[in-house]
């Protein structure tokens, strides 16, 4: 029996964490698909985003096995240069997969180790959307300095960047040069579920928004649109409040909404419960400024929920397949029109869009040939 190649995945957060959203799902799905062909080692932190306490009932600072994957949950005291280097040398990975752009321990240290010849593994860096112009505009001074330092040390030329779409690949080459090695492959989505039925009554609409409360996710845009929608509308916001100032602005809009519009905030909801909440709503809405994949979008589609999103994600041409709408944020009136259209749908009309959403997700799974593409990247 041949020995499986080893992939050591560095990520700040992993299950049972959920507050970091998409990056966690990217790593979980990656491990689930790739563990049949590779020995997967996940090196991660021992607590969720923003938490001061470690996960309950999780062994820390030692390798444990779960679902065919090796996991190491490092406490803050175990995160240092010497300890990380020891783990890399003990594992002797063939490949190192980095899942953040700016993390000190989970990205910068491994990059420097590669630069100075302390590790020989092939290094693949997934920026996870952090190089999009809409993301770089936050704290631009520090990020510009960091990019210049990487180029000064010639680190981009010694690794491979994993871009999840053509836009992200263009962002990478714009920052680090056309010659920088890149590979464009979409993220692994979650395994497809059966279509989840829900009844739709004309004049009534249940909307769900999931993600972080942060300007990039653009919740305030959705709330402004709801001001102009007639009918009985329920919006459930499933989110972690990351930007308190932005949330205060959103609350002001919520308090000014007309009476038929109801809004509920559900904070810090574990991933498995988010799936159940998506199933209990008619329409998934995310007017995001930019997503490099959008796991929650795909999860909604795969459950048979049409989506109303911006045109700043990989999920495009939705309307022609009756899966949803991907609209420019410059056209707020069109967002309002679609919300009103869906609110007015009866069950027969809605089920056509529900089936279209589910089929869109199925077509993606059948046509993408993702696993073979990843095996090319890790070769």
What is each stretch, according to the model?
Residues 45-49, 210, 234-251, 267:
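Glycosyltransferase donor-sugar binding loop
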């Amino acid at each position: 029996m041949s020995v499986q190649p080893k992939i050591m995945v560095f990520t700040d957060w992993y299950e049972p964490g959920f507050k970091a959203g998409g990056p966690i799902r990217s790593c979980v799905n990656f491990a689930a698909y790739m563990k049949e062909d590779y020995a997967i080692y996940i090196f991660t932190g021992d607590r969720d985003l923003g938490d001061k306490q470690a996960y309950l009932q999780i062994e820390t600072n030692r390798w444990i096995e779960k679902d065919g994957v090796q996991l190491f949950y490092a406490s803050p005291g175990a995160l240092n240069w010497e300890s990380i280097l020891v783990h890399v040398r003990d594992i002797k990975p063939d490949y190192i997969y980095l899942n953040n752009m700016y993390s000190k321990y989970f990205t910068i240290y491994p990059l420097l180790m590669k630069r100075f010849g302390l590790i020989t593994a092939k290094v693949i860096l997934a920026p996870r959307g952090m190089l999009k112009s809409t993301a770089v505009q936050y704290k631009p001074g520090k990020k510009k300095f960091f990019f210049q330092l990487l180029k000064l040390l010639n680190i981009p030329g010694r690794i491979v960047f994993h871009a999840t779409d053509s836009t992200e690949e263009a962002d990478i080459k714009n920052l680090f040069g056309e010659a920088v090695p890149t590979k464009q492959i979409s993220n692994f989505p979650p395994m497809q579920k059966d279509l989840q039925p829900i009844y739709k009554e004309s004049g009534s609409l249940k909307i769900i928004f999931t993600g972080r409360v942060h300007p990039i996710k653009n919740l305030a845009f959705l709330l402004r649109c709801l001001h102009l929608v007639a009918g009985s509308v329920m919006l459930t916001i499933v989110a972690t409040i990351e930007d308190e100032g932005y949330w205060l602005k959103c609350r002001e809009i919520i308090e000014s909404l007309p009476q038929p519009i109801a809004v509920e905030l559900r904070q810090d909801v574990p991933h498995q419960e988010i799936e159940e909440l998506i199933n209990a709503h008619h329409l998934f809405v995310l007017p995001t400024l930019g997503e490099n994949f959008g796991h929650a979008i795909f999860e909604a589609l795969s459950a048979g929920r049409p989506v109303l999103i911006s045109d700043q994600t990989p999920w495009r041409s939705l309307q022609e397949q009756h899966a949803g709408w991907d609209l420019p944020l410059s056209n707020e009136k069109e967002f309002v029109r679609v919300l009103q259209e869906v609110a007015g749908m009866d069950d027969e009309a809605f089920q056509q869009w529900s089936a279209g959403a589910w089929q869109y997700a199925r077509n993606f799974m059948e046509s993408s040939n993702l696993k073979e593409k990843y095996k090319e990247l890790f070769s």
